[in-house]
């Protein structure tokens, strides 16, 4: 009986030892696994810290990089002159030039626009002048209307006020066209024939004059030849030169006659404008109106509010040419 009891106790001790050994092995395995797991977690956390703690933070970092690139993009040195593509008030000079040319030489008839709108382009030649350009700009501001100024180099070079006015035209959202530097008919059109070399040289000289005021990156592809393109012989050679240099000449198909015949008062200029526009017919949907803001055109400034109101009453909206 004692012998059986001893064998039972020995067996129980062996089981206890095995259980203790199993527990120890389990503890060792647990510790080992924990040691292997913790560094991985730490490495993962370290990697996250290095790369960004979350997808949202990575997204923010990407946005910051993109914003930094946008900020670092150099701005054009052109006094803020916007391109045709960026200007909501501008129409394509290529289209306006083609439509006006077609209407003048009768290869096109109204309507010429494809959007159903009636549009008038107010254009002012020969400035800027300290006497009349400020008044024109003030009237345009009052009616929230944008215009296209065809400037002359000699007018720009005349004084610092004229230079400041050119900058003001740009700052107020108007379009700038090249009307040559000299505006000298005998130099540009000797014997009433276009001298292409002289014209191109004069246009380039005027663009350089504008760059000196507005900045080296300023450029305009819109030109208007003094007296109009169709007034002179030699147009074929000039057409080729314009195409080569990327110029678009935009003449006019309506005018207030402030540079024709005897000097007119404001009432007469308004009446001339009405007659000129009405002569285009009821379907006219693209009107390029010629006026001047140079010296001696005080009556044009006085007439301008009524001219704008008349055009508004006829359903026209005002756009620029770029």
Language-model regions: role of each:
Residues 161, 183-290, 294-311, 316-317, ...:
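Catalytic domains of cell-wall/extracellular-matrix polysaccharide-remodeling enzymes
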Residues 18-24, 36, 40-41, 165, ...:
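Functionally constrained cores in energy, signaling, and assembly domains
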Residues 86-194, 204-221:
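Active-site beta->alpha N-cap acidic-glycine motif
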Residues 24, 36, 87, 121, ...:
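Generic hydrophobic/packing signal
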Residues 17, 49, 60, 180-181, ...:
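Compositionally biased, intrinsically disordered low-complexity segments enriched
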Residues 2-8, 20-122, 129-135, 142, ...:
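N-terminal pre-catalytic segment of deacetylase/amide-hydrolase enzymes
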């Amino acid at each position: 009986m004692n012998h059986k009891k001893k064998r039972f106790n020995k067996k129980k001790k062996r089981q206890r030892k095995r259980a203790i050994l199993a527990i120890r092995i389990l503890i060792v395995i647990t510790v080992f696994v924990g040691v292997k797991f913790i560094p991985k977690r730490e490495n993962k956390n370290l990697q996250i810290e290095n790369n960004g703690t979350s997808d949202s933070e990575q997204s923010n970092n990407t946005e910051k990089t993109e914003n930094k690139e946008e900020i670092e993009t150099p701005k054009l040195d052109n006094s803020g002159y916007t391109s045709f593509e960026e200007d909501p008030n501008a129409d394509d000079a290529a289209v306006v030039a083609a439509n006006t040319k077609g209407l003048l030489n009768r290869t096109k008839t109204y309507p010429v626009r494809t959007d159903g709108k009636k549009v008038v382009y107010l254009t002012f030649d020969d400035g800027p002048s300290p006497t009349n350009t400020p008044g024109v700009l003030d009237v345009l501001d009052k009616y929230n209307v944008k215009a296209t100024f065809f400037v002359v180099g000699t007018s720009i070079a005349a004084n610092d006020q004229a230079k400041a006015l050119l900058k003001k035209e740009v700052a107020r959202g108007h379009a700038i066209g090249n009307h040559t530097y000299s505006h000298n008919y005998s130099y540009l059109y000797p014997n009433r024939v276009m001298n292409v070399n002289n014209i191109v040289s004069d246009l380039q000289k005027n663009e350089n004059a504008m760059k000196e005021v507005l900045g080296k990156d300023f450029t305009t592809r819109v030109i208007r030849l003094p007296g109009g393109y169709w007034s002179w012989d030699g147009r074929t050679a000039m057409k080729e030169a314009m195409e080569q240099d990327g110029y678009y000449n935009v003449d006019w198909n309506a005018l207030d006659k402030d540079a024709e015949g005897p000097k007119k008062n404001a009432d007469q200029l308004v009446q001339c404008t009405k007659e000129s526009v009405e002569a285009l017919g009821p379907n006219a949907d693209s009107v390029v109106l010629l006026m001047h803001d140079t010296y001696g055109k005080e009556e044009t400034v006085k007439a301008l509010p009524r001219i704008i109101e008349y055009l508004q009453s006829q359903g026209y909206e005002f756009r620029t040419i770029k």
